[in-house]
From Swiss-Prot:
Function: Transcription regulator that activates transcription by stimulating RNA polymerase (RNAP) recycling in case of stress conditions such as supercoiled DNA or high salt concentrations. Probably acts by releasing the RNAP, when it is trapped or immobilized on tightly supercoiled DNA. Does not activate transcription on linear DNA. Probably not involved in DNA repair.
Gene that this sequence comes from: rapA
EC number: 3.6.4.-
Family label: Belongs to the SNF2/RAD54 helicase family. RapA subfamily.
Gene Ontology process terms (BP): regulation of DNA-templated transcription
Protein name stated in the entry: RNA polymerase-associated protein RapA
Domain Helicase C-terminal: from-to ranges: 473-627
NCBIfam families the UniProt entry points to: PRK04914.1 (NF003426)
Residue ranges constituting the Helicase ATP-binding domain according to the UniProt record: 164-332
Binding site for ATP: 177-184
Gene3D superfamilies: 2.30.30.140, 2.30.30.930, 3.30.360.80, 6.10.140.1500, 6.10.140.2230, P-loop containing nucleotide triphosphate hydrolases (3.40.50.300), Tandem AAA-ATPase domain (3.40.50.10810)
Record's subunit section: Interacts with the RNAP. Has a higher affinity for the core RNAP than for the holoenzyme. Its ATPase activity is stimulated by binding to RNAP.
Matches recorded under Pfam families: Helicase_C (PF00271), RapA_C (PF12137), SNF2-rel_dom (PF00176), Tudor_1_RapA (PF18339), Tudor_RapA (PF18337)
Length: 948
């Protein structure tokens, strides 16, 4: 029968519930006009199939007048098609409320309200809501939360440091890993995990200007963190009173900040939870004087609770330098340089004893005495067990020593010597004759090392006279690429102009498909170039990069590197090799170095190879040697006697060997063990790889995309293209691009194809989609037909989903103890709960959809019965909720008490444990227990099942 519409009646939109209560204005022929006063919107619907549900309240319901007072309904009267509600107001006085005077802002979000208002959702949405709750609960309890979503190969020492640091309240640490071990990834993991956990909300990243772009790329590509890059132009053009306050994550160049006092004032006023400083070894400090940069960072460190300093300076080459960094972290603890040196010497024999235990599996009398003197009477039983060959006791002893290590909690330093998994390197030098065209170039830096740039700078050359027509390195490159055939080859040169010219040369002279990559391209253009290079089937054989353009990129799927020229500094040389030489590289790195004979290029090659040994091994001493020998090196590169040159190379080699020996003998094995995680990181790696192999996420996301009207189609193996369809349900779905995106769930694919989104449980698209499901009301009601021969036709089952949760600041981490969990109840006609006997999936497979009109009619007919059974379901679930809360309180108290006891005991023997850290943990314990006391049980969803 057709609906009867009367002006003044209140109806609610089935598709736009957020509009609030609608009022019928007019019925004109086949059109129905409805006003939604809450938003001021007017809608016209076809009279035959208007997506509207009549608003009818029942005795017991509480309703609101547009002036704000509430009425508890006792009786409902229908007068000429309009409802009039009679009942008691807040003062228990009898009152009447016609439906025309109902509040316009009433929304039916509660499951029971929506069910009885006729807002019944598709079965698929009910399942989606249930699965979303289950996955949310599981992820909040996961030890991998914030660690597994990074677009990087999981590496043990990085994961250990990230977890150790990110799980502290306001961490203040120095990350001093050797070059190539991934300090930027470690910092990104810490930032990401702190943000997800709520321990930090606003992060300031200070970097040298030349590394701003690298950080921007790393944070966005690896962690999906939207970092705001600040410079003078952005700061001046901003309309905000304080431009920094609008950015959750700000990336700032230290050079600009030092010169701009206005920007400094704004930065201090903005308020930050965590500060990250890269290249911290460039902050100059001496006992009698500090640089402007150091002083600025020092002032910021005094007002920002969390501080992360990144430095590449080897400790033994700069103990004073490390002290300067540690001073920034904890000036009370590190106040005296002489005392710091003495303390470091105090730990050296202990570290040597630990090394002996690791190498020999037992302790010599001397090592035993050293450790006994260090631990005192407390360590005697442990040492006795170690001497008896107890391997577990050995592990406990090492952990005890690590805990007491002077800087073990604030300083992390991993070395290549201690970390396994790096590839070997092979060097292939190619001396080539210097062409005549380069011999008479005007003097200058370009002419010395980059003659092609100097040649081009002389003026526009005819096409047949361009430098790549006569430079023998180009002929060599073409021949080498042909010899390597389909093998991927990365070519790096110093300048963007050279990279673009080489692409022209390869196209014109050989037809070899090449992709180019330089700083003049946008990030999107670089992504496309990198993707073209990475494509195994149809991609380019060669990618030609400029020095700056390749910063922060990872091309470890290739293992042939051509250096078309050599950089002027060993750090840049290591950065070039580091594009391929990473943990996880499966092949030996092949380094191809063409150079022009009898030129500065030849001498620079000899300097790096014979003096610094920088091609075949990492060169931690390179920066110091370049600084020490620079005054002799530069004049001799341009020319000069071969005898003087040979002497310089020999001197540099001798000094390098001396420094390397000093580094080796001075290795702090205790520090390395602590930084590497002593096996804990490897367990995290295995857990992440196991999670990667599961299909739960792709299966869940497919249902999510279907629900929101996102079309997916195959792109290639392990990759999908997502596009919004015409039926897209919610324009706010975080697809990332209105035109569509390409995604992969495969980590290896994501590492080689940076143009693809790497979907994990932590990805903004996944998290945003789940938030849309749980924050909306869609899916919290359903009615279905159940096909089961064991059930008598007409039998009604009621499935209820309750959520047991605590609403609290994320920083308290209560989701670890009481994650929002869906507590399911399946009631039969006698009130028995069958949920433990009938799994959700089993039940789901037996259900069929019911037309909405029929479902609504059935619900209205059974309203009183259903309302009683809903109350009965809550009574059955409440004891489970109460026990969950009690268990959460017990776990929180036990964990916090154990950690507090450890820190208090540790503080007695290791002053690096700050009072503020212990106080913060005590407060977190108290606040957490208080918030758990307020945990609530909420009816999340209702499904009515009728046997047929």
């Amino acid at each position: 029968m057709a609906q009867q519409y009367q002006p003044g009646q209140r109806w609610i939109s089935d598709s736009e519930a957020e509009l609030g209560l609608g009022t019928i204005l007019a019925q004109d022929g086949r059109l129905l006009t409805v006003l939604y006063p809450a938003t001021g919107d007017t809608r016209q619907y076809s009279l035959r199939n208007a997506p509207l549900t009549r608003v009818r309240f029942s005795p017991g319901d509480q309703i609101t007048h547009f002036e704000g007072w509430k009425l508890t309904v006792r009786e409902v009267e229908d007068i000429d098609g309009l409802m009039v509600y009679h009942g008691l107001d807040g003062q228990n006085q009898p009152r009447t409320l016609p439906e025309t005077q109902l509040s316009n802002f009433i929304q039916f979000r509660l499951a029971s309200d929506r069910l009885f208002a006729g807002q019944i959702d598709p079965l698929s949405w009910f399942s989606l809501r249930y699965n979303t709750l289950q996955h949310t609960s599981k992820q909040m309890q996961s030890a991998l939360w914030g660690l597994g979503g990074c677009r990087a190969q999981p590496i043990a020492h990085q994961l250990h440091i990230a977890r150790e640091v990110a799980d502290r309240s306001a961490p203040r640490v120095l990350l001093a890993d050797e070059v190539g071990l991934g300090k930027t990834i470690e910092a990104g993991l810490v930032i990401h995990r702190q943000l997800l956990s709520g321990r930090a909300n606003r992060v300031l990243i200070l970097v040298p200007e030349n590394l701003q772009h690298q950080w921007l790329v790393e944070m966005r590509r690896r962690f999906n963190l939207q970092v705001a890059l600040f410079d003078a132009e952005r700061f001046i053009e901003s309309d905000a009173s304080n431009p920094f306050e609008d950015a959750q994550l700000a990336l700032v160049a230290l050079e600009w900040l030092v010169d701009d006092e206005k920007a400094q004032d704004a930065l201090f006023a903005a308020g930050w939870d965590l500060m990250v400083v890269d290249e911290a070894h460039h902050l100059v400090w001496h006992e009698d004087q500090a640089s402007t940069e150091y002083s600025l960072v020092e002032q910021l460190a005094q007002v920002i609770p969390g501080v992360l300093l990144l430095t590449a300076t080897p400790e033994q080459l700069g103990q004073d330098s490390h002290f300067a960094r540690l001073r920034l972290l904890d000036p009370n603890r590190f106040h005296d340089l002489a005392a710091f040196r003495a303390e470091s010497e105090h730990y050296r024999p202990v570290a040597e004893a630990v090394q002996e235990l690791l190498d020999e599996g037992r302790l010599s009398p001397k090592a035993h005495a050293t450790i006994q003197g260090f631990l005192g009477a407390e360590g005697e039983a442990l040492l006795a067990a170690v001497n008896d060959g107890d391997t577990q006791a050995s592990a406990r002893l090492i952990r005890e020593l690590l805990d007491r290590h002077g800087t073990g909690r604030v300083l992390f330093r991993n070395t290549r010597a201690a970390i396994q998994g790096f590839p070997e390197r092979q060097l292939h030098p190619y001396p080539l004759a210097t062409p005549e065209q380069y011999r008479d170039l005007p003097a200058g830096e370009h002419a010395e090392l980059y003659p092609e740039v100097a040649f081009q700078a002389q003026g526009e050359a005819a096409d047949d006279e361009r430098w790549w027509r006569f430079d023998p390195r180009v002929d060599w490159l073409i021949d080498t690429l042909k010899m390597l055939k389909r093998t991927k080859v990365l070519v790096i040169c110093a300048h963007a102009e050279t990279a673009m010219d080489l692409e022209d040369a390869l196209r014109v002279r050989s037809g070899i498909p090449a992709s180019v990559f330089h700083e003049g391209m946008s990030i999107l253009e670089r992504d496309r170039a990198a993707a073209y290079f990475a494509d195994e089937e149809f991609g380019a054989q060669v990618l030609i990069c400029s020095e700056i353009g390749s910063e922060g990129r990872n091309f470890q799927f290739a293992h042939h590197l051509v250096m078309f020229d050599l950089p002027a500094h060993p750090d840049l040389l290591e950065q070039r090799i580091g594009r391929l030489d990473r943990i996880g590289q499966k092949h030996t790195i092949q380094l191809h170095i063409p150079y022009l004979q009898d030129s500065p290029q030849e001498r620079l090659f000899q300097w790096y190879h014979e003096g610094l040994n920088a091609f075949l091994n990492t060169c931690p001493t390179g920066n110091a040697l370049q600084h020490q020998f620079g005054p002799r090196l530069l004049p001799l590169l341009e020319g000069g006697e071969s005898k003087a040159w040979d002497a310089l190379v020999a001197d540099a080699r001798g000094e390098r060997e001396r420094l390397e020996a000093e580094l080796h003998t001075g290795r702090d094995r205790l520090l390395e063990l602590n930084s590497g995680g002593a096996g804990e990181g490897q367990a995290l790696v295995e857990d992440i790889l196991e999670q990667d192999d599961q299909f739960a996420l792709p299966i869940y996301m497919e249902t999510l995309f279907d629900a929101f009207g996102i079309d997916s189609e195959d792109h290639s193996e392990n990759a999908l293209i997502l596009k919004p369809s015409e039926k897209m349900l919610d324009a706010s779905f975080p697809l990332g691009d209105d035109e569509g995106v390409t995604i992969t769930y495969d980590r290896a694919q994501a590492l080689s194809r940076e143009d693809m989104q790497f979907l994990t449980w932590e990805h903004p698209m996944v998290q945003g989609g789940m938030d849309l499901v749980l924050s909306g009301s869609m899916g919290n009601t359903a009615v279905a037909l159940i096909k089961n021969k064991a059930l008598k036709p007409g039998t009604v089952l009621l499935e209820l989903l309750f959520v047991s949760e605590v609403v609290a600041p994320r920083s308290l981490q209560l989701g670890r103890y009481l994650p929002p969990a869906a507590l399911r109840c399946l009631l039969d006609a006698n009130g028995n709960d069958l949920a433990s006997r009938v799994a959700f999936e089993t039940l789901n497979d037996q259900l069929e959809s019911v037309p909405r009109a029929s479902a609504n009619k059935f619900v209205q007919a059974q309203r009183d019965v259903l309302a009683k059974r809903i109350s009965g379901g809550e009574e059955k679930i409440l004891p489970i909720h109460v026990e969950r809360v009690a268990e959460a309180q017990r776990r929180l108290a036990a964990e916090a008490d154990e950690e507090l006891a450890r820190l208090v005991a540790l503080q007695a023997v290791n002053p690096s444990v700050r009072d503020s850290e212990i106080d913060a943990l005590r407060k977190q314990r108290e606040d957490g227990l208080a918030m758990l006391e307020k945990a609530a049980l909420r009816l999340e969803a209702i499904r009515v099942l009728v046997a047929g």
